[in-house]
């Protein structure tokens, strides 16, 4: 089925910027954080002090204007101040498989947006295989790191950035 924003409009493919607003945790928005000795922040986090947060775009190479739950997607920050804007999943200590940003993207991304309760969740499909893993939140250093946490997804609503 079609992925909808907070106004009930279809989320558009490779167009518009969207806030991911947490359903459960009240306030907080997407941000980037440095981990270890990274030269620039590359870890995607939900930061309670950062609202409404960075905006993302959903992209599929399919020639279709809207995003559906069955589509494999690239997710990227827009507008981005750095070359690294595309989401990927990589090992990160101690969170495990964490969402990071990279400057390279495959044509078809490894994520899907799927309905969950009051909102949506992001599901990571390694190698775009059959089995998906929920992207959840791992709490550390007053931030919530987006990481694989199967069965405990981060549930959010999708608000178009122009609907202030």
From Swiss-Prot:
Pfam families: Kunitz_legume. Inhibitor of trypsin and human plasma kallikrein with a Ki of 2.9 nM and 14.0 nM, respectively. Does not inhibit chymotrypsin, porcine pancreatic elastas, human neutrophil elastase, coagulation factor Xa, human thrombin, porcine pancreatic kallikrein or plasmin. Belongs to the leguminous Kunitz-type inhibitor family. The keyword Aminoacyl-tRNA synthetase does not apply. The lineage of its organism: Eukaryota, Viridiplantae, Streptophyta, Embryophyta, Tracheophyta. The record marks 63-64 as: Reactive bond for elastase. Keywords: Protease inhibitor, Serine protease inhibitor. GO terms for molecular function: serine-type endopeptidase inhibitor activity. InterPro entries: Kunitz_inhibitor_STI-like_sf, Prot_inh_Kunz-lg. This is Kunitz-type trypsin inhibitor BrTI.
């Amino acid at each position: 089925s079609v992925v909808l924003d907070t106004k009930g409009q279809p989320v558009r493919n490779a167009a518009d910027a969207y806030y991911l607003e947490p359903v459960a945790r009240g306030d907080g928005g997407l941000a980037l954080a440095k981990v270890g000795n990274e030269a620039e922040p590359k870890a995607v986090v939900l930061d309670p002090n950062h609202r409404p947060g960075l905006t993302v775009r959903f992209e599929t190479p399919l020639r279709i204007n809207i995003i559906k739950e069955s589509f494999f997607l690239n997710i990227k920050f827009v507008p981005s101040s750095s070359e690294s804007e595309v989401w990927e999943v990589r090992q990160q200590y101690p969170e495990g498989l964490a969402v990071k940003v990279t400057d390279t993207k495959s044509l078809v991304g490894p994520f899907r947006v799927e309905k969950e309760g009051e909102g949506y969740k992001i599901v990571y499909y390694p190698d775009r295989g059959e089995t998906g893993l929920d992207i959840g939140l791992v709490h550390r250093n007053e931030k919530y790191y987006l990481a694989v946490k199967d069965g405990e997804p981060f549930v959010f609503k999708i608000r178009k950035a122009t609907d202030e």
